[in-house]
Amino acid sequence: MKSQYFTEEHELFRQSVRQFVQKEILPYGNQWETEEKISRDLFLKLGEQGFLGINHEEAYGGTKSDIFYTCAYLEELAKSSYAGVCAAVSVHQYMATNHIAEAGTHELKERFLRPSIEGKKVGAIAITEPFGGSDVQSMRTTAVRDGDHYIINGSKTFITNGHFCDFVVVACKTDANAGINGISLIVIERGTPGFSSTQLKKIGWHSSDTGELAFDNVKVPVENIVGKEGMGFFYIMESFQIERLVAGILGIGGGEQCLEETLKYMNEREAFGRQIKKFQVLRHEMVQLYTELEAGKQMTYNACWLVQNGEIPVKESSMVKLYMTELSNKIVDKCLQMFGGYGYMEDFPIARAYRDARVGTIVGGTTQIMREILSKIIIDDVRYKKVYSNPEEIKSSAVSENKTAVEKTWGNPQTAKEIILSIPLRIKKEKASDYSTVFQFDISGDNGGQYTLIVNNGNAKVEEGLQGTPECVVTTDAKVYEDIELGRMDPTMAFMGGQIRVTNIGAMMQFAKFFHRI
């Protein structure tokens, strides 16, 4: 069938990946599942075939092929039904090395990118910490400058390839007081004194090793920093878009394989004297799954097309991640049901698919985080800019965006008290003409206090103390409240991390529509 995205060359490439999977993955997959790691030879063979370089520049051994080669490649890897293999390879190729490829120096690229493309080195990326998952900016791992080196202390967890890798790109705070502007990416090599790892046990992705990393006074040369100091958070945010598309592409291949295996079983399995594919309820269930997968496929390909044409499709990639990972769970659940008791047996690949799919709605940004990102874009009209090509512009805008307009309108509030007292000046009067509410703010710490905000048909006032019957009570520390209001902390992350408590989240979301942000 003709495609607006794939050419004959793409299809020939797809066939070569399919043959590779049949020869180099399928015969060894069960062994890797048992050993809980894949063979290093697989990376070497992927490198020899040129697969690990399809997304990287030619100067370092890649081919810089268009993104639809990546689609064909990852879909075929996913059809192996070994999601752990897919995780290990995709993290190495599209996440760990991606930052080095986009922002690293020539020296870093020669030391880490080139051998990664050749399959001679395996990479990992370490962002998640024991005390914070999706909340990137709350990380505690630090990198303190000491002459020509950084001294790194902290820990990371749930790191794919973490116990297996030759190097890891670590997100850490180079300036503990700068918020999101103080996070940097630094490469640490396996074997560096003070760097240790422990392999974690998981319910799925068995062939992909997952590690917990510890850094105890790890000394790393300053040359190992990726890009500019203090730009790590922004690099991570942009690279998340590719990570989310990778999840969607793998979901296409895995979903198609799961449905194909289920149809094959339905052809063979008989009940009540006929093939179970003849039962209308089962036929309709399968057709519905195929329809939903086709919708997800087109959504994913459209987002990939946007990337290919120079866009950073935050909205579309977040939709892909949200939709495809939820759909993957639905597909494996429905398909396992078709297999009946056999689907619950480890001898059938559907059992492994069921275990493996579950983590999809957690890694790379949870379903809940995807929905909040989309809420900001669709409801709050938030816009995102490219980072790698405009690092200084992005960093400065994170600090001072709209500062002039703010000062002209309602001053320049900095403390929690000043911010709360400025709320009546920030009301969108026309939009809030029919809006009435009572909010209480219980703010602890210096510059905190207790306040009641009363809004009556677009007119707002703040009174000291907790008065009346509130629709919502906001409880937090003054520093946290200031960081949220001044753009130094993501409110969703603060809420999920328990740093701010809101008694009525629906009322708070409604409230936010009627007031200008600082």
PLM regions with names:
Residues 148-149, 153-198:
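A short core secondary-structure module
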Residues 214-238:
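A short, charged helix-loop
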Residues 116, 131-134, 158-161, 175-177, ...:
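Short Gly/Pro-enriched turn/cap motifs at secondary-structure boundaries
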Residues 119-127, 436-443:
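A short, Trp-centered hydrophobic/proline-enriched beta-strand micro-motif
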Residues 138, 191-221, 466:
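Flexible, small-/acidic-enriched active-site or ligand-binding loops
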Residues 1-81, 90-91, 103-108, 115-120, ...:
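Alpha-helical interface subdomain recognition
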Residues 395-518:
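Feature captures hydrophobic
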Residues 141-144, 453:
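A structural signal for short hydrophobic beta-strand segments in well-ordered beta-sheet cores
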